[in-house]
Structures are given as C-alpha cells and as structure tokens.
Amino acid sequence: MATDNTKRKAAIIGSGNIGTDLMIKIMRRSRHLDVAAMVGIDPASDGLARAAKLGVATTHEGVQGLTRLSVFDEIDFVFDATSAGAHVKNDAFLRTLKPGIRVIDLTPAAIGPYCVPVVNLDAHLDAPNVNMVTCGGQATIPMVAAVSRVAKVHYAEIVASISSRSAGPGTRANIDEFTETTSKAIEAVGGAGKGKAIIVLNPAEPPLMMRDTVYVLSEAADRAQIEASVERMAAAVQAYVPGYRLKQSVQFDDIPANAPLHIPGLGRFSGLKTSVFIEVEGAAHYLPAYAGNLDIMTSAALATAERMAASLVNA
C-alpha cells in the first residue's frame, strides 16, 4: 500500500454533492491519492466546511483560488465536478500553469476521451483529461459493451431513472449534455452503431434507487454467451461499485425479418433484442443510499484516477 509520502495529491473542483462524496471516498478508500484541496464558489457550502474540518485546504474562489493555494504546486490530479461549461474553462486555465496535470472530468463536457473503467480505461491511462461520461453512461455502457463482445450491436437505447432528490443543480443544468454525451459514448465505448439515452427524474417519495434499462439490438447470437458476458461485466463493475446489480435475468426477444422494428435514423431492424435491467444502490459515504447515480460517478472517477496514479508509481 502506498504511504502518504508516495500518494499523489489531488484537488476537487466543485464542493457540491458529487465533490463532497468523492472527497470522502478518496479519504476512506484510496491507496494512491490524497485529497489536498477542495474548491468551491459558495463560502457557505457544506462541502467546503466538511473539507476544512477534515484538514483539507479550501477556497471559495473557484479554480483561480486553487492556483493561489500553497499546495497547488504539489497537485498532480484534479477532479472537476462542476458543470460542462465550467469544465472547459477550468481545464484550459489549469493547463496554462500545469500543462501536464491529470484531469478527471465528472461533467458531460467531454473534451477528453470517454472513460468507463471496466471497458476502456487501459487505453487512456496516459490521457491528460478523461471524461467520465454520465451516471447513466457508467451504469449502462458496460452492458452494451458486454453484448458487443459477443455480437455486432446495431442500436442501443438506455433509460436512466434517478430520484429527483438526487439531482442537484448541476445535474439539472446539464440534462441536454447528459443525453448527448451518453448517446455518443454508447457508440464510442459501448460499440453500438447508434446510441440513444433518456434520463427520467423520478419525484416519488420515499426516493427510489437509480434504475437503468438497457435495450440492445444486435445480430443473431448465442443467448447463453451474451448472458454470461453481461454477468461477467456486472461483476467487474461491482468491484468498484458494490451496490451495482442486475435487477433480474437478461431478457431476449427475436425480431423476425418479416416483422422488423423501425428505428429512427437506422431503418428496419431484425435480429436479437437483449434487455438488461440494473439497479444501483449508493454506498452512503456522504449521499443517501438511493443516490446511486451520484455514487457510481464518484466510484468510477476514483477507480480511474487510482489506476492512473498506480501506473505512475510503477512507471
């Protein structure tokens, strides 16, 4: 295990729900990272108060404030949990001072390559900026990729249902970016010819856990092989998101050539339809257990940065 002297120092930009949960996760679970700074814009935010109480350097003056902290010179990793628009500016500003800094983007900005740890992290260990897609993407793209490993996927559609209470101002401000980024990543990372993403904010009380439905249209293939691939992938995600689970058995439907589906932008489809149903329970480090959508983002971001930091140690 890495000692405090060999751990890489990290800063978190965004002192809201995601940033605060990420800070606690790093403190409790990280082998290679140490939280050195928490950055916000609201001096009264709970995240900054908690960070200060835990001995972490704080600033409420945004990314400019981060660069004025004495610890900035030691920072190797930055997690950005702000918004898509803010991230573009934050990354550009940081690189004027530290061109080689590693940035883990938890917004839908996607100025770096999409990263879903169980699918394509190995290809991006040296990337200066990686994008964690979205909560829906982290939950569902592994399932699309699992089918892609067995059969050619022509189309994949995901529906992410999250509790309204777990959707903070950042999530709500990025709904359009959420659907666009997730759809593109379903194709680029999941391997689908065409992808579509839908997000549903569920106002139910008491709040429901995150649930995701994945529909995959592929060429005909061995159902047992697809099911086994899905189960292996779910187990791989569970390694860093323990609350991730298949809600029920994988379902299959044959779409015959004489009764094809019509997919907008794709045309007629016949082949195999695979349906996967997922539930994500949060670890409740800082956020409630129903906020699995936020937990999977912070867990995936930490898993990504851990591997990157470990690769630097072993280089």
UniProtKB/Swiss-Prot annotation:
InterPro entries: Acetaldehyde_dehydrogenase, Acetylaldehyde_DH_C, NAD(P)-bd_dom_sf, Semialdehyde_DH_NAD-bd
Reactions mediated catalytically: acetaldehyde + NAD(+) + CoA = acetyl-CoA + NADH + H(+)
Active-site residues, as the UniProt record annotates them: 135
An example molecular function term from Gene Ontology annotations: NAD binding
HAMAP family: Ac_ald_DH_ac
Family, per entry: Belongs to the acetaldehyde dehydrogenase family.
Name of the protein this chain belongs to: Acetaldehyde dehydrogenase 2
Origin species: Paraburkholderia phymatum (strain DSM 17167 / CIP 108236 / LMG 21445 / STM815)
Lineage of the species this protein comes from: Bacteria, Pseudomonadati, Pseudomonadota, Betaproteobacteria, Burkholderiales
